[in-house]
């Protein structure tokens, strides 16, 4: 949003206000993280399709396995079926030395051991070799289809499960395959949420009401500086964040990420001569691009377009390109990094309060899930905004940390909080403002809801956002803002 510097010795000055741009970036990231978390929570249900680790026992007794085909063949199957992974390497090594052994069984065993250890490339290589050696073995076909499923190769998995069924499987295994098909249907659908809410904002124009007299004479102020007063307003807001993946072949996918959110404020600017009359906003983003996805990695290249509406007019149209890589280190740890470049082009009306510029951004993220209902996440972002005017160009870095926790119980209570600290410095001294601008901003976002209190499938959610911006030019850019909203959200 714009700020206006007013003084009798200066007719007008249009200021490019970075905090409003930062606010949109923060809201976009918060919604994207929320959508990603929803997908990860659904993926946790898929883990129930795999048996947990066990111990090396059979019917309560421990057996010594001699080096014979008659003993090692069933021992390998028992070790696999009961997750006796510590003993499996010894069994397979001795089994391979025996004449007349089945190479496919040894490769299947080594594949499942590699899967247990998290080495999916080796697991797939060994299982595909086993399938080539015994193309009609139902167990090999089933395990290969499961590996393809876990590696996000849905088309291959679907074909693999069909071949396994044709090879003949017990009824309980057929029911398990049906569960895999249901899981693939869920994967192929839309994920995300839509929300509608009402609330209150105590400073929609990010103002501070600063006043000072620059020159007195004989008790009369001849030169004064007066900034706008904060405008309070009730509001209506909405959010829509969706994601869908189309498996093309193997690990290659087409990914869609549409997103839109906005706020309507009941109050407008009381000054009819002000450049900014209506602070209501709407942001829409569409990302369409390529994604490589396997059991451990997600690599995406996403061109996108962004449209911003405010002051009752189209404000700007931006287009950009995002490259993102995320790596799952273990069941608990995930890291990621991203590069983003974007070009903002303002409309004729938008140029009253802004100017065209380029933004380049690098980000680093990490998340830790100590338990299935708790997630800690953090990130660091470096940004560069380049205008034609050096005084308006800036560099900034931002650090954020967040916590999500779902409480046990019928109410389904959950809380999601994020804190952001941002430090921004402009490139050059501005003689109109009298200094080289530097801002330090804090943003706190807290949302809490109850999945057990749904009304017509809608979850009630309370959200509070508080922003504090300190500047060496505090009279122009310093402000505090608090927004509270009650939303009803539908998860997809």
Predicted regions and their residues:
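N-terminal signal peptide c-region/cleavage motif recognized by signal peptidases
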Residues: 17-19
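Flexible helix-coil transition and linker loops at the boundaries of alpha-helical arrays
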Residues: 60-63, 95-99
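N-terminal export/targeting signal detector
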Residues: 10, 21-24
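Bacterial N-terminal signal peptides that target proteins for export
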Residues: 2-10
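Gram-negative and organellar
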Residues: 24-60, 68, 76-82, 86-93, ...
């Amino acid at each position: 949003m714009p700020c206006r510097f007013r003084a009798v010795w200066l007719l007008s000055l249009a200021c490019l206000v970075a905090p409003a741009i930062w606010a949109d970036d923060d809201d976009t990231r918060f919604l994207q993280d929320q959508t990603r978390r929803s997908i990860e929570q659904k993926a946790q249900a898929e883990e129930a399709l795999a048996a947990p680790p066990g111990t090396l026992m059979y019917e309560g007794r421990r057996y010594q396995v001699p080096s014979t085909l008659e003993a090692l063949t069933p021992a390998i199957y028992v070790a696999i079926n009961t997750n006796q992974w510590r003993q499996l390497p010894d069994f397979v090594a001795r089994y391979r030395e025996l004449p007349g052994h089945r190479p496919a069984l040894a490769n299947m065993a080594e594949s499942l051991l590699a899967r247990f250890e998290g080495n999916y490339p080796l697991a797939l290589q060994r299982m595909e070799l086993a399938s080539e050696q015994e193309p009609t073995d139902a167990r090999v076909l089933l395990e290969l289809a499961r590996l393809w499923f876990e590696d996000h190769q849905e088309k291959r998995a679907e074909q693999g499960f069909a071949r396994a069924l044709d090879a003949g499987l017990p009824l309980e295994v057929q029911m398990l395959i049906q569960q895999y098909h249901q899981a693939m249907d869920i994967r192929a659908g839309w994920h995300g949420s839509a929300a509608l809410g009402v609330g209150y904002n105590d400073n929609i124009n990010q103002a501070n009401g600063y006043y000072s007299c620059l020159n007195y004479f004989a008790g009369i102020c001849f030169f004064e500086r007066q900034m706008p007063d904060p405008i309070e307003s009730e509001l209506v807001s909405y959010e829509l964040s969706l994601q869908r993946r189309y498996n093309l072949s193997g690990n290659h996918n087409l990914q869609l990420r549409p997103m839109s959110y906005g706020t309507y404020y009941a109050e407008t600017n009381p000054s009819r001569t002000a450049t900014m009359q209506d602070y209501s906003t709407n942001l829409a983003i569409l990302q369409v691009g390529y994604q490589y996805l396997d059991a451990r990695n997600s690599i995406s290249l996403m061109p996108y377009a962004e449209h911003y509406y405010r002051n009752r007019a189209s404000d700007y149209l931006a287009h950009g390109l995002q490259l993102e890589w995320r790596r799952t280190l273990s069941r608990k740890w995930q890291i990621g990094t991203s590069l983003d470049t974007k070009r903002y082009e303002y409309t004729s009306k938008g140029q009253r309060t802004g100017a065209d510029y380029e933004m380049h951004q690098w980000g680093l993220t990490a998340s830790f899930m100590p338990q299935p209902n708790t997630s800690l996440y953090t990130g660091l972002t470096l940004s560069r905004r380049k205008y034609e005017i050096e005084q308006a160009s800036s560099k900034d870095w931002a650090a954020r940390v967040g916590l999500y926790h779902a409480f046990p119980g019928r109410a389904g209570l959950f809380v999601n909080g994020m804190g952001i600290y941002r430090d921004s410095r402009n490139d050059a001294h501005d003689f109109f403002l009298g200094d080289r601008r530097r801002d330090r901003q804090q943003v706190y976002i807290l949302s809490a809801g109850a999945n057990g209190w749904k009304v017509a499938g809608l979850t009630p959610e309370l959200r509070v956002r508080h922003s504090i911006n300190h500047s060496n030019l505090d009279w122009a850019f310093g402000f505090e803002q608090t927004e509270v909203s009650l939303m009803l959200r539908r998860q997809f």
